[in-house]
């Protein structure tokens, strides 16, 4: 529990450590092009920094990053670049975010945090982690290179690539993680995982991947058991025969394992089955809070009370927080990973001139309130508005304990009501309690084709809802959304917002949406569902799949 111990110590003086980190960043980067332009050498205090340095977004850096990728040095940062993180492109266009060696060191320091949290969770009592764990990584690590030769990959993929020497701990063929070819990954991940009886952990960047993994097994267990019994790989249009032959050469028939699995599945899948499939399974690790909470509920159906570690609070711009407890959606901010500022939610739309000098420090936050996070990282981004709004739940020493709430620009705002994701999620959760339906996923957008404008709420359920229940469900959603947002209720009463329209979707709509995103180049590791739709193309996709 070495890193947890270090974190606990640093959090006792978190605000001071974070501020000293800022002054160190400014000193180290005073000779860069950005540092000279913004007079880093003249900054002596936090107050000076806030007066001199503007807020920023990625577009402010894009031209500089392009130059860095062509080999120019000392543009945004003097620190050596480790790699460029290719963003998923699920929010706007994809980007290449510089990630320095200094930032990578922070990630490496916390890469065993799940094991440490699990050890603290069990207090050294059984079931402890085996001495030779077998982990399933539901992730891929594909890479490219910038014009100057620097590696381009996704955030999670980079740190898999770095630790190839530990592949003996992985319960699947390394080929599946590192291969650049198209392949039927859901089938291959499920097959290799089911073959490995001694699996100890299931890891993924986001809980959606774990949910998809279990749902695939639920639907295809008969074929999977047959292939395990025969020691063959099932042909598929997405996987080349060459790759199938290469992978298949490592498979061997296992009739005994197939019999064990069939016995489990034939009893029924309406109970937690993970511990029966893998008696040594200790935990699941994935980000499963906020917009991923619905996937966490699905995974719970399969794993029962096996603990979940919510991993880290991170983005392509850096690692900002870690979960220090099992089964908790909270993250402790890491003081040494950058300098953090916080904008109160209610102030987020005030003028930048005012906000620049009125951000709050780590030790000035009120538990229960929401704040927009502003980051100065170790990779050349200064006062960067990453767009996340977080809820502060308390403190761990002096460091804030946060939960992700919503993306600042992912809101519905027709008449000034500013409805964000967690308000609609509240309505969805309340609906499930009232009518006992299984909501696979949902998305929403503003519809200006009527007067007054209204919300469109796209919802997929399993099983599908009978048409005669649709109006009742719509009315309940309207009621619960009004409970969640007094402004929504107010503007509905004043008829500045029209009645919400519920659109029920065909089965597998959201699975198809994820497949389309991957087909268009999004990384499976980073794929995040956008609950609030802000572009016409995505809206048209969902409209076209109305049930």
Predicted features along the sequence, with ranges:
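Conserved adenylation A10 loop of the ANL superfamily
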Residues: 84-98, 213, 502
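Long, hydrophobic, well-ordered secondary-structure blocks that form the structural core
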Residues: 98, 103-110, 309, 316
